[in-house]
Swiss-Prot record:
Chloroplast recorded as keyword: yes
Taxonomic lineage: Eukaryota, Sar, Stramenopiles, Ochrophyta, Bacillariophyta
Gene source species: Trieres chinensis
Domain of life where this protein originates: Eukaryota
Family matches, as HAMAP family: Ribosomal_uS19
Role, per record: Protein S19 forms a complex with S13 that binds strongly to the 16S ribosomal RNA.
GO cellular component: chloroplast; mitochondrial small ribosomal subunit
Name recorded for this polypeptide: Small ribosomal subunit protein uS19c
Gene Ontology molecular functions: rRNA binding; structural constituent of ribosome
Pfam family, one: Ribosomal_S19
Statement: the UniProt record of this protein carries the keyword Transcription regulation: no
SUPFAM superfamilies xref list: Ribosomal protein S19
InterPro entries: Ribosomal_uS19 (IPR002222), Ribosomal_uS19_bac-type (IPR005732), Ribosomal_uS19_CS (IPR020934), Ribosomal_uS19_SF (IPR023575)
Family named by the database record: Belongs to the universal ribosomal protein uS19 family.
Length: 92
């Protein structure tokens, strides 16, 4: 279920504070965060945010198409390990 419109989107306070400070100064540094549940707002467009996936911080450049989504949607937490594809002759 989507979040109630009455409540508004969730954004971590520390992340919003860093974005506002960088917008005021005009800087474009990489912002590291662990908040995967934060919603991407229009004020974040143009910034690079490094989101933690459990092992490392993965940088995401925020563009117009990402507004309204969560930060965690673009950073996978699980690595896919496929099975080794071998020849049919070796299985016999």
């Amino acid at each position: 279920m989507p979040r109630s419109l009455k409540k508004g989107p969730f954004v971590a306070y520390h992340l919003l504070k860093k974005i506002d400070k960088m917008n005021a100064s005009g800087k474009k540094d990489v912002i590291t965060t662990w908040s995967r549940t934060s919603t991407i707002l229009p004020t974040m467009v143009g910034h690079t945010i490094a989101v933690y996936n459990g092992r490392q911080h993965v940088p995401i450049f925020i563009s117009d198409q990402l507004v309204g989504h969560k930060l965690g949607e673009f950073v996978s937490t699980r690595t896919f390990k496929s099975h080794i594809k071998t020849d049919k002759k070796t299985k016999r």
